[in-house]
Amino acid sequence: MMNEMTVEELALGERKFLHDIANHIVVAHGMSNFVLKTIKESKPIGAKDIERLEKSIEAINKMTALLKERRTLLHQLT
């Protein structure tokens, strides 16, 4: 089991975690909305749209990794 963390350390870690997750949500949301708009307007899907979808998936993958790391940390603390 890891060393006891102070309440302040836990709060700072949680704040950073939430900040990182929020950033990735904004990226995934924004990029996917651009592509959705293109699809709704029946415009052809271009390389830029593919890049946006890739960025969206990358952001989701990063969130998944952050959640797994956080879950591991919390299991170590309990």
Task: Enumerate the predicted regions with their spans.
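Histidine phosphotransfer helical core of two-component systems
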Residues: 2-13, 24-78
